[in-house]
């Protein structure tokens, strides 16, 4: 399971010209599901995302997680993160989770974060989304479990 996280000052997701999810300070989480992923990996990754210290403390060091920084999550499904780009000029998605598997794990990820008290907004699974963000830093990390 893969989470590409970006520290943002604002981010939003639009579908059909309508904003369906938006946050101010926080993390934009692009979430990719691979074939071997399961609920155990989902929980491990969700905990890592929520605990990862990418926000600056009073000394300018990255010592605060999203909750400690008073931020929120915007979680967007992105199956292309599971692409194999090692050969040729076209990505292969043979390692990506099936749409049914990915939807279940995406929804579990969001529910898990919310159950832990994390303010969490979402995109729309499998929709054509327009994602806008202001990357703060820029700070971007690729987390995998």
Swiss-Prot record:
Its main location: cytoplasm. Keywords: Cytoplasm, Hydrolase, RNA-binding, tRNA-binding. It catalyses: glycyl-tRNA(Ala) + H2O = tRNA(Ala) + glycine + H(+); a D-aminoacyl-tRNA + H2O = a tRNA + a D-alpha-amino acid + H(+). Transmembrane segments: none annotated. The keyword Nucleus does not apply. NCBIfam families: D-aminoacyl-tRNA deacylase (TIGR00256). Homodimer. This is D-aminoacyl-tRNA deacylase. Pfam families: Tyr_Deacylase. InterPro entries: Daa-tRNA_deacyls_DTD, DTD-like_sf. It is found in: Cytoplasm. The gene is dtd. Its EC number is 3.1.1.96. One of its GO terms (molecular function) is Ser(Gly)-tRNA(Ala) hydrolase activity. An aminoacyl-tRNA editing enzyme that deacylates mischarged D-aminoacyl-tRNAs. Also deacylates mischarged glycyl-tRNA(Ala), protecting cells against glycine mischarging by AlaRS. Acts via tRNA-based rather than protein-based catalysis; rejects L-amino acids rather than detecting D-amino acids in the active site. By recycling D-aminoacyl-tRNA to D-amino acids and free tRNA molecules, this enzyme counteracts the toxicity associated with the formation of D-aminoacyl-tRNA entities in vivo and helps enforce protein L-homochirality. GO terms for cellular component: cytoplasm. A Gly-cisPro motif from one monomer fits into the active site of the other monomer to allow specific chiral rejection of L-amino acids. One of its GO terms (biological process) is D-amino acid catabolic process. A motif (Gly-cisPro motif, important for rejection of L-amino acids) lies at residues 137-138. Belongs to the DTD family.
């Amino acid at each position: 399971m893969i989470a590409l996280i970006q520290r943002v000052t604002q981010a939003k997701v639009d579908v059909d010209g309508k904003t369906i999810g938006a946050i101010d300070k926080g993390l934009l989480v692009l979430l990719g599901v691979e074939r071997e992923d399961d609920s155990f990996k989902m929980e491990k990754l969700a905990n890592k995302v929520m605990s990862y210290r990418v926000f600056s403390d009073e000394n300018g060091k990255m010592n605060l997680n999203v909750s400690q920084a008073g931020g929120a999550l915007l979680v967007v499904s992105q199956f292309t993160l599971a692409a194999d780009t090692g050969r040729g000029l076209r990505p292969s998605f043979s390692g990506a989770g099936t749409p049914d598997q990915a939807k279940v794990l995406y929804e579990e990820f969001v529910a898990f974060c919310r159950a832990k008290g994390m303010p969490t907004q979402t995109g729309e699974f499998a929709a054509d989304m327009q994602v806008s963000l202001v990357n703060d830093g820029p700070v971007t990390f690729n987390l995998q479990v």
